């Protein structure tokens, strides 16, 4: 036992010595073979520096890190004492890229793809990506039915370790469809079946929307469309048995022959909903709108499955699996459908994040989100938040990213990824008129000022006849989420010159305010208050005896209004017509108006009732 313990201790001591000997302190780092890249740039891509204590493991990692840059073709490491020497062979630098022969693929489409593959001027050349490019372009031409396309990439290397790339594209020739035959069709006419195809033979001049050019991809799409047609009309066992494409002698035309078996039509005898679905069993059953003895319809069943998964996703079950298991009675030609539903875990939202909002404050976005943190995940509310963010017009794009916290967790983090866009404008004008003199105008508008979600508009006009200022601002969330405030301040001086009256100045200034409270998603109550001062002044104090001095009129008013933001659509004859009806019962007491718009055979109605009171003094 003593000998055994001594032997184990010896091995441990020996392994420590070996480990210590494998590590050393770096005295110097050298790079040989660098031409297009500096040594400092190379040093940034290795995990150690001069004076670091490293092992062989660190050296291997440094080689991997240098290769990841994509700038080096070969790397070998040697040691001179405690100096590490990297012997490097650089990849050539692409001096220019020339593409010719591409007529079907536009350069505006091809250039971004070349950039994605790093095939552009100034990048390191990698032969692997040119092979990927060749295969991708060739496959594209074959998919659209081009015969014998050819892609050649010429590489011209120079002495300064650069390469010029020329991409020569031969798009091949177009293949026409000589004939399409479908064998085995009995339930429908040949014309009906062929009308389902986008591909048509070139003799079918009557079908203007068809394509007479052969495309393998388009043919597969047509066959899938044909299968869906049969499966949606009760033919449960329909199948495409054969697909044959024969090239004619000139290789410019093909004959297409399709063999199908229709089978018999099947009806649905009954359906059953299976699974631990409490308390949603009845609600889910109501979503399945299948009547006994109606023909089997795969499209309808797919829609029902989507409705079920969508419904449960609004209650936190985001990974629901619905499997439709048919029980077939071949004798009666009936099918009983079993909707086997596994709701799985119920998820709730842990955190909601926002990214991309460099200007807009988080709180501006968060108040638009209806899904709450700590509540069960609701697809409807999450998507509604996206729509409301888009409705602000602050963002050109809004994306939703869902991330599970962990595999075993039932928590989801939601990220709204936004892309901000310009929400304001400034217009400036300067001119000169014989009567008005030098004229200056400024218009400023900003809908999301300082990222606060508030808006500000300023209009200024100044010339010899007029001094005009109008400032309006809007606070969509003034007190809390259901209250908004709109305010306006205005000032206007306008000078009139008539034949027998001169230097008459009309002066107007005042303010307006409106406070709105949202009652529900559709109705809002508005309370408004305003003041306007109007005066007419004669600078010369004399207007041929008609008027001397000053006339003042002040108006103070308030109003209460009810808005209905719902739009009612009723289809009627008519197109692109707009009708507006305004009814004034009293100019000083009650104002009632109603707008009706007719657009594309629909009536869009927005109604508003306002009770107003005015005081003049």
Swiss-Prot record:
Subunit text: Part of the Bam complex.
GO annotations of cellular component type: Bam protein complex
GO biological process, one term: Gram-negative-bacterium-type cell outer membrane assembly
Localization per record: Cell outer membrane
UniProt entry keywords in alphabetical sequence: Cell outer membrane, Membrane, Repeat, Signal, Transmembrane, Transmembrane beta strand
InterPro entries associated with the record: Bac_surfAg_D15, BamA/TamA_POTRA, D15-like, HotDog_dom_sf, OM_assembly_BamA, POTRA
Coiled coil: none
Signal sequence extent: 1-20
POTRA domain span: 24-91, 92-172, 175-263, 266-344, 347-421
Pfam families (alphabetical): Omp85 (PF01103), POTRA (PF07244)
PANTHER family membership: OUTER MEMBRANE PROTEIN ASSEMBLY FACTOR BAMA, SORTING AND ASSEMBLY MACHINERY SAMM50 PROTEIN FAMILY MEMBER
Organism of provenance: Buchnera aphidicola subsp. Acyrthosiphon pisum (strain APS) (Acyrthosiphon pisum symbiotic bacterium)
Superkingdom classification of source: Bacteria
Function description: Part of the outer membrane protein assembly complex, which is involved in assembly and insertion of beta-barrel proteins into the outer membrane.
Name this protein carries in UniProt: Outer membrane protein assembly factor BamA
Protein family per UniProt: Belongs to the BamA family.
């Amino acid at each position: 036992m003593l000998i055994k313990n001594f032997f184990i201790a010896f091995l441990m001591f020996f392994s420590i010595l070996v480990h210590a000997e494998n590590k050393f302190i770096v005295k110097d780092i050298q790079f040989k073979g660098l031409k297009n890249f500096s040594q400092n740039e190379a040093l940034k891509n290795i995990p150690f520096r001069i004076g670091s204590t490293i092992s062989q493991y660190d050296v291997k990692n440094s080689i991997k890190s240098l290769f990841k840059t994509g700038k080096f073709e070969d790397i070998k490491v040697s040691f001179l004492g405690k100096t590490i020497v990297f012997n490097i062979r650089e990849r050539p630098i692409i001096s220019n890229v020339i593409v010719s022969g591409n007529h079907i693929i536009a350069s505006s489409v091809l250039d971004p793809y070349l950039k994605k593959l790093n095939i552009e001027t100034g990048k390191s050349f990698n032969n692997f990506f040119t092979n990927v490019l060749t295969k991708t372009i060739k496959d594209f031409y074959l998919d659209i039915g081009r015969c014998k396309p050819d892609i050649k990439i010429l590489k011209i290397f120079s002495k300064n370790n650069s390469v010029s790339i020329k991409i020569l594209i031969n798009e091949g020739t177009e293949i026409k469809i000589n004939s399409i035959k479908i064998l085995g069709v009995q339930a429908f006419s040949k014309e009906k079946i062929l009308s389902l195809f986008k591909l048509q033979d070139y003799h079918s001049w009557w079908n203007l929307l068809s394509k007479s050019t052969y495309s393998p991809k388009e043919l597969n799409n047509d066959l899938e469309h044909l299968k869906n047609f049969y499966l949606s009309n009760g033919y449960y066992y329909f199948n495409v048995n054969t697909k044959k494409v024969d090239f004619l002698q000139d290789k410019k035309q093909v004959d297409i022959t399709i063999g199908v078996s229709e089978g018999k039509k099947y009806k649905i005898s009954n359906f059953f909903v299976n699974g631990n679905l409490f308390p949603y069993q009845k609600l889910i059953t109501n979503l399945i709108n299948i009547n006994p003895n109606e023909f089997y319809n795969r499209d309808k069943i797919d829609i029902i499955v989507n409705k079920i998964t969508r419904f449960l996703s609004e209650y936190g079950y985001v990974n629901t699996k619905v499997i439709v298991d048919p029980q077939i009675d071949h004798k009666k030609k009936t099918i009983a459908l079993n909707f086997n539903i596994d709701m799985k875990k119920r998820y709730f939202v842990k955190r909601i994040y926002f990214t991309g909002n460099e200007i807009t404050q988080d709180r501006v976005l968060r108040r638009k989100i209806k899904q709450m943190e700590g509540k069960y995940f609701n697809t409807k509310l999450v998507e509604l938040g996206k729509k409301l963010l888009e409705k602000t017009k602050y963002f050109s794009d809004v994306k939703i990213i869902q991330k599970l916290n962990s595999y075993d967790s039932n928590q989801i983090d939601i990220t709204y990824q936004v892309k901000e866009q310009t929400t304001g404008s400034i217009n400036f004008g300067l001119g000169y008129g014989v009567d008005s003199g030098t004229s200056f105008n400024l218009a400023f508008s900003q809908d999301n000022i300082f990222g606060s979600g508030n808006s500000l508009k300023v209009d200024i006009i100044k010339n010899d006849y007029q001094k005009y200022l109008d400032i309006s601002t809007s606070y969509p969330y003034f007190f809390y989420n259901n209250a908004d405030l709109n305010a306006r301040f205005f000032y206007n001086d306008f000078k009139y010159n008539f034949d027998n009256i001169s230097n008459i100045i009309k002066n107007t200034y005042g303010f307006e305010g409106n406070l709105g409270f949202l009652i529900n998603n559709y109705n809002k109550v508005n309370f408004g208050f305003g003041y306007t001062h109007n005066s007419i002044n004669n600078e010369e104090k004399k207007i041929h005896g008609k008027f001397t001095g000053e006339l003042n009129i002040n108006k103070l008013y308030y109003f209460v209004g009810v808005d209905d933001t719902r739009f009612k659509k009723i289809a009627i004859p008519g197109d692109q017509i707009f009708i507006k009806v305004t009814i004034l019962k009293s100019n000083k007491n009650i104002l009632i108006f109603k707008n009706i718009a007719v657009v594309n055979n629909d009536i869009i109605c927005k109604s508003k009732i306002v009770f107003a009171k005015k005081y003049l003094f």
